[in-house]
């Protein structure tokens, strides 16, 4: 089982949905980064359950506790361990799925590979394990901000409802105005109605989440097998329920001509008289040849509907070796996309932080030497 990602700035994720705790060990963060539990708590609150009618009713405070790696309010260059204790498990809700794998979940695959599976809340296969992503990502985001890099994720589609009028200039402000985390306020209302309708039906719905990273310098990435977009795709696919990743124009580029989508370069005059190299369009999503080109890095992930629904579904009984049906109880999100935004931001930050150190943009041991 692989629970580690990153070559220098690395994250080791641990814990399960109904276990005692979850968290992450962050290694490779340079010393002298100002960091507090509040910095991480802000990010955890973005993915915390039970915050609106659009999420699971499971009430968890998700309070972070840092147990290593901080000295006098700053990172000291040693591994940073962050822990979140589970407080509201209801394992009895899962007793009926011990031998009946849930359709759409990884239960069957875990049983086949390991021969044992913590079925309570999905165990290590639960979306709750993304707490580890967010702990690592919160630290990565704080590190990246010292270099002027900002990351924002937002919902651009729920079901067949698309955000068509996104105000990117006021994106974060508009995201904060609705529970869907969508930058198009009119579309957000329709999305919320759809999610609540699916919830009432005992069903769920999927969508698409877009992530934008600005301020990223040109030259991040290591071809051939260390491409920046390759590493981003890997960590984004590690997020539960993600079934597809695209960078920039993505799959739309397959039906276009090069003359239509090639990003043409130009020199842009800065206020101080210097020049910056930019592209007139950003169809490549800020990455060419596996390396950043200085434009915003744009990715989108396809998030499938939460497979835990209350409708009766067909499955099998592994103990009796016969066909069966299952009706899933418990507390589940009718749409996971609003909470995935926080995880997508964190996942992106982890990879960018790792590549910033690998590329020599951030000093590997002492942040003071980078600023």
Language model region names:
Residues 10-13, 118-129, 218-222, 282-288, ...:
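A short glycine/serine-rich beta->alpha loop
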Residues 44-103, 107:
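Glycine-rich, N-terminal phosphate-binding loop and its surrounding beta-alpha-beta segment
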Residues 20-32, 128-149, 230-234, 295-297, ...:
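Alpha-helical support elements that line or immediately flank enzyme active sites
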Residues 10, 308-371:
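Internal helix-turn-beta structural module
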Residues 113-224:
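Glycine-rich, mobile lid/loop segments that gate access to catalytic sites or pores
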Residues 97-123, 314-332:
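Short acidic, glycine/tyrosine-flanked loop/strand segments centered on an H-E-D-like triad
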Residues 1-58:
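N-terminal, positively charged regions that mediate nucleic acid binding
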């Amino acid at each position: 089982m692989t629970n580690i990602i990153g070559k220098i700035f690395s994250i080791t994720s641990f814990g399960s949905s109904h276990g005692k705790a979850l968290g992450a060990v962050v290694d490779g963060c340079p010393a002298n980064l100002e960091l507090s539990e509040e910095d991480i708590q802000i990010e955890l609150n973005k993915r915390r359950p039970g915050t609106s009618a659009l999420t699971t009713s499971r009430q968890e405070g998700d309070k972070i506790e840092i147990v290593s790696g901080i000295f006098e309010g700053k990172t000291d260059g040693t591994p940073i361990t962050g822990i979140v204790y589970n407080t509201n498990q209801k394992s009895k809700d899962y007793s009926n799925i011990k031998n009946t794998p849930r359709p759409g979940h990884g239960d069957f695959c875990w049983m086949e590979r390991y021969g044992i599976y913590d079925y309570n809340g999905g165990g290590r296969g639960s979306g709750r394990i993304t707490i580890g992503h967010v702990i690592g990502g919160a630290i990565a985001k704080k590190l990246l901000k010292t270099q002027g890099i900002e990351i924002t994720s937002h919902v651009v589609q729920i079901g067949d409802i698309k955000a068509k009028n996104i105000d990117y200039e006021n994106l974060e402000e508009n995201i904060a105005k609705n529970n869907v985390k969508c930058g198009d306020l009119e579309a957000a209302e329709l999305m919320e109605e759809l999610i609540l309708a699916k919830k009432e039906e005992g069903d769920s719905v999927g969508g698409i989440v877009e992530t934008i990273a600005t301020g990223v310098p040109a030259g991040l990435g290591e071809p051939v097998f260390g491409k920046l977009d390759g590493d981003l795709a890997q960590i984004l696919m590690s997020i539960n329920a993600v079934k597809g990743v695209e960078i920039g124009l993505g799959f739309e580029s397959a039906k276009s001509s090069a003359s239509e989508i090639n990003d043409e370069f130009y020199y842009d005059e800065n206020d101080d008289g210097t020049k910056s190299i930019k592209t007139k369009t950003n169809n490549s999503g800020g990455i060419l040849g596996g390396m950043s080109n200085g434009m915003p890095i744009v990715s989108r992930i396809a998030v499938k509907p939460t497979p835990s629904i209350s409708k009766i579904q067909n499955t099998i009984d592994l103990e009796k070796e016969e066909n069966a049906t299952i009706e899933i109880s418990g507390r589940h999100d009718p749409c996971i996309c609003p909470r995935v935004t926080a995880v997508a931001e964190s996942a992106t930050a982890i990879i960018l932080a790792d590549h910033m150190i690998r590329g020599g943009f951030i000093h590997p041991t002492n942040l003071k030497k980078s600023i």
